[in-house]
């Protein structure tokens, strides 16, 4: 039965026939569904105009506009209840604005995202699953709701039958939906990660409402410096082109402008490709298309590349971290909205919002994030989080030594690559052989996250033969990591997914296709493989000769025909296998690291609630492996200890053999607290 709870019954009687009751008449169990309709998207400048509650038997709309009920009137009836919502992160923000902080919530959108992480919807052209309310209701219960009124309900409110029906529908079968999803969560072994994420979104909603403190004056000064730096690099680029490529020099005399001008626009990728080609800097990607993307041009050692990348970085600071941010400052704070999870369980920012996770880490930028007057910033981060997690999962000896003894992994890899360093300790290598340590650094990161010899060949411009030698050296140093990765891979291709922390799972992309290709490839005999390789070489030979303008006739036409008939399924099979192997090394580490930070944030938020520090100790950002808080000066030591302890507890909860370190500091800005 549907009921409207209002002080203005006559208003709704003009719209249609409805059932009515009072707040006291509501029959609510321990678990209820909840939704809110609001006048806009942001709690700091909008409000709730109705709350909908559902029990599975009855649904209630409580009206909160036109001098009707207030949210505080509803609070006594929902305090202590378990609340089920869909994207309840949104509703929590508005409830927090009314000083109501539910202790236990569940979210059907989170459940859907966790269940179908990485999976493809076979009923929708194998596109990724969608998780909006309508899509989940249709998929799980076969119920189709008309969501047309969703776009305008903040304007028309409950003034027409369709918006009233829409509001009832949002809670009508929500408990049933949650029960169906929960059965799948339990049978699939997802319960622990689901519970964590439902606990975590309470903290995430708080972080959204806290906002990130920023000094508008400091940001404006940074903007001025960034523009000046960008113009400086623009001039460097233009003068270099003028001096070295006379065909692009504008020689027309201008009595009022003595600059070295060029007749090419450096903001035009098409025109700049011609400039790069004139410098004989390769611009072809793996598909043969021209690009001046960093990953393509950085393979060249030409000095113009370094200048260009410096200009691009300077320009990026202006276009992305300049006026765009400044315009969104509200009372010396920035706000954003988060997506609770991506496929690695990491946090992300919702599309169209400021990306709090992507601010440059330089001191100039970070020092713009200044605590409000009388406050300080408290920052705590993990020490080598991903190395610790990878070492704990894999048991790799080199990584474990790095965690336990403080060994430098870049130095360890440098010793393998450069035998002359074998007898030197870390300190000597860092001081006297910085170039060789640096040479080991980039490939080591690439390999640790599932890259291959081909990856560093493409990204670093290293000859392929040398890249294979470097890869083999890394595999020798980190044999334990690869042995573990192979085990994860072998389990994953049997199950069709990678499992990591708390039952978090990632469905292998295009797994059905992989199995199809695998069957066909495994059916190829030894003799057929010989023919395939022979045909491949002959096919490549003809291609190379034609590129040189020379005629070439196949020596082994039958082998070439066989190669061409099999090359798609063979290449696709090995491409997917390589992608899976990369994911098996990377995803479990990323997912476990994400769970560590989410548990730490949840512990901290619960502590803030329990100790009545709401809106005093604020969680203002969590980025990768750190938590950033703001608090009054007199609470800085209490906050420092609490953040540090939360991170240690959350981090070590997910480790079996090792311990992780976390160090907190405070200062007037994010940068000075690091």
At which residue positions do the language-model features occur?
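Conserved "right-hand" nucleotidyltransferase catalytic core of DNA-directed polymerases
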Residues: 1-24, 28-29, 33-38, 42-45, ...
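Short, contiguous acidic/charged loop-to-helix segments that flank catalytic cores in large enzymes
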Residues: 296, 321-329, 339-342, 360, ...
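C-terminal structured "cap/appendage" subdomains that terminate the fold
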Residues: 607, 611-663
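Active-site-proximal helix-loop-helix substrate-binding element of RNase H-like nuclease domains
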Residues: 2-12, 42-186, 196, 411-427
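Hydrophobic, well-ordered secondary-structure elements that form the walls
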Residues: 345, 381, 414, 456, ...
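Conserved catalytic core of nucleic-acid polymerases
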Residues: 205, 209, 282, 339-340, ...
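Short glycine-rich phosphate-binding loop at a beta-alpha junction
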Residues: 82-87, 265, 381, 628-630
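Short, conserved secondary-structure transition motifs
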Residues: 110-120, 266-267, 274, 496, ...
């Amino acid at each position: 039965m549907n009921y409207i709870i209002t002080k203005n019954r006559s208003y709704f009687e003009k719209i249609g026939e409805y059932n009515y009751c009072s707040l006291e008449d509501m029959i609510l169990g321990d678990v209820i569904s909840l939704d809110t309709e609001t006048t806009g998207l942001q709690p700091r400048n909008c409000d709730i105009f109705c709350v909908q509650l559902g029990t599975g038997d009855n649904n209630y709309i409580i009206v909160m506009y036109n001098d009707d009920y207030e949210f505080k009137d509803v609070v006594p009836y929902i305090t202590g209840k378990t609340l089920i919502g869909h994207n309840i992160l949104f509703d929590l923000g508005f409830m927090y604005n009314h000083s109501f902080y539910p202790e236990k919530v569940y979210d059907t959108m989170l459940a859907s995202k966790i269940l179908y992480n990485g999976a493809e919807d076979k009923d929708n052209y194998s596109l990724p699953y969608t998780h909006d309310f309508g899509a989940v209701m249709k998929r799980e219960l076969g119920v189709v709701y008309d969501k047309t009124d969703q776009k305008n309900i903040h304007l028309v409110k409950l003034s027409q039958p369709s918006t009233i029906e829409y509001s009832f529908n949002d809670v009508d079968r929500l408990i049933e939906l949650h029960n169906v999803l929960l059965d799948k969560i339990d049978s699939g072994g997802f319960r622990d990660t689901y519970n964590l994420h439902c606990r975590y979104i309470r903290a995430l909603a708080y972080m959204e409402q806290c906002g990130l403190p920023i000094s508008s004056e400091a940001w404006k000064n940074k903007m001025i410096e960034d523009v000046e730096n960008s113009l400086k690099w623009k001039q460097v680029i233009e003068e270099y082109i003028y001096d070295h490529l006379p065909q692009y020099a504008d020689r027309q005399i201008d009595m009022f402008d003595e600059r070295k001008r060029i007749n090419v626009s450096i903001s035009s990728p098409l025109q700049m490709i011609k400039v790069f080609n004139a410098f004989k800097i390769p611009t072809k990607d793996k598909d043969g298309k021209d690009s001046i993307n960093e990953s393509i041009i950085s393979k060249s050692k030409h000095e113009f590349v370094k200048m260009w990348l410096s200009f691009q970085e300077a320009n990026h600071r202006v276009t992305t971290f300049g006026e765009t941010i400044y315009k969104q400052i509200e009372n010396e704070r920035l706000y954003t909205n988060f997506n609770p999870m991506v496929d690695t369980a990491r946090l992300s920012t919702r599309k169209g919002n400021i990306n709090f996770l992507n601010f440059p880490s330089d001191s100039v930028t970070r020092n713009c994030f200044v605590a409000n007057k009388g406050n300080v910033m408290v920052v705590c981060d993990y020490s080598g989080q991903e190395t610790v997690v990878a070492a704990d999962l894999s048991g790799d000896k080199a990584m474990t030594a790095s965690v336990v003894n403080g060994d430098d992994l870049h130095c360890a890899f440098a010793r393998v690559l450069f035998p002359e360093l074998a007898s030197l300790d870390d300190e000597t290598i860092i001081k006297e052989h910085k170039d060789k340590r640096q040479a080991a650094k980039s490939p080591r990161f690439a390999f640790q996250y599932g890259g291959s010899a081909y990856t560093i060949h493409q990204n670093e411009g290293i000859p392929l033969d040398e890249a294979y030698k470097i890869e083999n050296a890394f595999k020798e140093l980190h044999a334990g990591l690869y042995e573990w990765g192979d085990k994860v891979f072998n389990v994953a291709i049997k199950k069709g997914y990678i499992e990591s922390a708390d039952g978090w799972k990632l469905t292998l992309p295009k797994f059905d296709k992989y199995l199809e290709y695998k069957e066909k490839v495994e059916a190829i005999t030894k003799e057929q493989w010989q023919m395939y390789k022979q045909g491949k070489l002959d096919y490549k030979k003809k291609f190379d000769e034609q590129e040189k303008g020379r005629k070439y006739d196949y020596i082994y036409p039958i082998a070439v025909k066989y190669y061409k008939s099999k090359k798609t399924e063979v290449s696709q099979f090995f491409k997917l296998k390589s992608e899976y192997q990369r994911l098996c090394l990377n995803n479990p580490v990323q997912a476990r690291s994400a769970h560590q930070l989410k548990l730490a944030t949840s512990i901290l938020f619960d502590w803030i609630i329990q100790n009545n520090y709401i809106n005093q100790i604020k969680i203002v950002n969590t980025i990768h492996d750190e938590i950033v808080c703001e608090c009054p000066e007199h609470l800085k030591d209490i906050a420092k200890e609490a953040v540090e302890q939360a991170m240690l507890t959350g981090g070590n909860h997910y480790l079996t053999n090792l311990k992780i370190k976390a160090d907190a500091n405070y200062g007037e800005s994010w940068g000075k607290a690091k």
